[in-house]
């Protein structure tokens, strides 16, 4: 019973309208099959209310099992009804003693959806009968997309890859998320496209009709013109070659057709003259040194100098000129003026009143910093006494008697 409850619960969740015109089989044919079974059972001479009730119960179970099986299969192909030939074949097979595939049917849909088990456990390969609805699914995209989208529909059914258990990725117990099934369909009816947007590569290039083409639209990066440009350029090149070849052939034919004594010698003389001129031009030019110098002098620009003799054409205004010599007195006066300029002092100069000591310029801060009495190093301020000694011995700069050698 839990299996029945789970199945009923699953039908309600997946499709609430599951029981509205979901059976593809004709109920009248199911009833006819049940009546035939009744007749066969009653033909043996067994007739009674018990036999009739048993036959009715068997017919109901058969119809319920067939309805459930068709519900599971029709959820994928509801929009694409089967052709009449396929429907008749399915109905004939359904009249055989069916088996209600509850749990095993759910499990085996992922393994081999193209195979089913009969009551004796034999595997029936119904793949060629289920193919037509899938081919009809491809017909609409082909008509809508036109030339742009092409899918491989013309390939026969036998050449398609076998969708075995686990296959390339999506089957039960397979290798995880692989390349999906070969024909681009999942076990749940979901389709996996071979090519995604923005990619030129297709996973099944030898199956699909998509062809990889370079970006040659003439715009954007990595575009080198269009295919039409090559088609338009190539005939010109071929025509030029053909025209050149034709002209060569015509010349050869003319030379062959002309007799030996008429125009042939004229052409030979012209060819000889051209050959002689070419040979002369190709040879190196030889000349003597004098000829080469003459050519160089012609090309060289001549420089003209205004050469004249001494006192020739001299200007008369410069005749009275004489040379000036510097006197020694002027040089001494210039030296005195320079010294006065450096040592002359204004009346309000106070530099003589300032005390300038040149004692210890190398270490000026040692004496003043000598306190540090708090740390017990108070003996260092005595170094400041050097400045007093140096100040006492320093000469007075303004006193001329302190520098007798300069007097």
Swiss-Prot record:
The modification Omega-N-methylarginine is found at residues 165, 188, 216, 363, 366, 369. This is SERPINE1 mRNA-binding protein 1. Belongs to the SERBP1-HABP4 family. The modification Phosphoserine is found at residues 25, 197, 199, 203, 205, 208, 221, 234, 329, 391, 393. Ribosome-binding protein that promotes ribosome hibernation, a process during which ribosomes are stabilized in an inactive state and preserved from proteasomal degradation. Acts via its association with EEF2/eEF2 factor, sequestering EEF2/eEF2 at the A-site of the ribosome and promoting ribosome stabilization and storage in an inactive state. May also play a role in the regulation of mRNA stability: binds to the 3'-most 134 nt of the SERPINE1/PAI1 mRNA, a region which confers cyclic nucleotide regulation of message decay. Seems to play a role in PML-nuclear bodies formation. GO terms for molecular function: mRNA 3'-UTR binding; ribosome binding; RNA binding; SUMO binding; translation elongation factor binding; translation repressor activity. There is a cross-link at residues 52, 228 (Glycyl lysine isopeptide (Lys-Gly) (interchain with G-Cter in SUMO1)). The modification Phosphothreonine is found at residue 226. GO terms for biological process: negative regulation of translation; PML body organization; regulation of apoptotic process; ribosome hibernation. The lineage of its organism: Eukaryota, Metazoa, Chordata, Craniata, Vertebrata.
């Amino acid at each position: 019973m839990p299996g029945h409850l789970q199945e009923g619960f699953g039908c309600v969740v997946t499709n609430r309208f599951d029981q509205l015109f979901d059976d593809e089989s004709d109920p009248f044919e199911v009833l006819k099959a049940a009546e035939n079974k009744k007749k066969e059972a009653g033909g043996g001479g067994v007739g009674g209310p018990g036999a009739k009730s048993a036959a009715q119960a068997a017919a109901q179970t058969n119809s319920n099992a067939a309805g459930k099986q068709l519900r599971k299969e029709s959820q994928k192909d509801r929009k694409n009804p089967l052709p009449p030939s396929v429907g008749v074949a399915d109905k004939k097979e359904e009249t055989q003693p069916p088996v209600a595939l509850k749990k095993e049917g759910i499990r085996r849909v992922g393994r081999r959806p193209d195979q089913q088990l009969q009551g004796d456990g034999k595997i029936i390969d119904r793949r060629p009968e289920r193919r037509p609805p899938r081919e009809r699914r491809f017909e609409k995209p082909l008509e809508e997309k036109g030339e742009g989208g092409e899918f491989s529909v013309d390939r026969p059914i036998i050449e398609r890859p076998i969708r075995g258990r686990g296959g390339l990725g999506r089957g039960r117990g397979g290798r995880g998320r692989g390349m999906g099934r070969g024909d681009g369909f999942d076990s749940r009816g979901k389709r996996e496209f071979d090519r995604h947007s923005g990619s030129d590569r297709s996973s099944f290039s030898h199956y699909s009709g998509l062809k990889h083409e370079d970006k040659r639209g003439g715009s954007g990066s990595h575009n080198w013109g269009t295919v039409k440009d090559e088609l338009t350029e190539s005939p010109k090149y071929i025509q030029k070659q053909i025209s050149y070849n034709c002209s060569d052939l015509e010349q050869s034919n003319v030379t062959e057709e002309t007799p030996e004594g008429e125009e042939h010698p004229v052409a030979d003389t012209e060819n000889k003259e051209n050959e002689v001129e070419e040979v002369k031009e190709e040879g190196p030019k030889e000349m003597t040194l004098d000829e080469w110098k003459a050519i160089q002098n012609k090309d060289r620009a001549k420089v003209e100098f205004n050469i004249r003799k001494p006192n020739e054409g001299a200007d008369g205004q410069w005749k009275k000129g004489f040379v000036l010599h510097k006197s020694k007195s002027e040089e001494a006066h210039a030296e005195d003026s320079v010294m006065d300029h450096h040592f002359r002092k204004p009346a309000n100069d106070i530099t003589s009143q300032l005390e300038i000591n040149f004692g210890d310029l190398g270490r000026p801060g040692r004496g003043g910093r000598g306190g540090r009495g708090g740390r017990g190093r108070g003996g260092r301020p005595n170094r400041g006494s050097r400045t007093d000694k140096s100040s006492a011995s320093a000469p007075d700069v303004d006193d001329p008697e302190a520098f007798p050698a300069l007097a």
